[in-house]
Amino acid sequence: TKLDSLILDLRNNPGGLLNSSIDVANLFIDSDGIVVYTEGRVSKSDVSFPTEAGDILNGAPIIVLMNKGSASASEIVAGALQDHRRAIIMGQESFGKGSVQSMLSLEDGFGLKLTTARYYTPSGRSIQAKGIAPDIYLEDITLSSFEDAINLSSQEKDLKNHLLAESPSELSEEDILEMQDEITENRDKEYIELLREDYFVHEAINVLKALKVITNK
């Protein structure tokens, strides 16, 4: 089945192999350039990893979800797709694990791991300690925080001795207030159900729907 869009969820992805991140990014990039490059104090630390044109989605829109738990290889993927304008990054600024470490062998089976270089996105942004900034920021919203907000919220009708609205209908004041309460309760239930599912994914779907409308104009 042909995909018309994709949500790539990299939230809480701590990373993995460098080669794997390059392979993943290359699945969706159809332009010349690089996926990522490294720079260090010694010349042999300076390495570029080129793109291999071949977008398997043929330009279909991509949303990448990230949060503070997205690190290392997942940041390489997100940074490459963002710089090549191949995806919209949504969520939160990533962890910022952009250092290259080399292992030096010592005597008696010991080893020493040294940080020798940093990773940079195609446009030259350092990932280390900065992370990847999202194009669209999303705040973490928990079910408990939403319910607290509901309890704290108030409207005119919630105030003691509030002025009642005039109504030309035959409904009584009690009926009208009951209907208002039911509408509010149903709305709150919808939002709570959304949070139980996945707020980030829901917002990503909304963006993809908007992109589809724009591109079809």
Task: Describe each model-derived feature in a short phrase.
Residues 1-217:
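C-terminal "post-core" interaction segments
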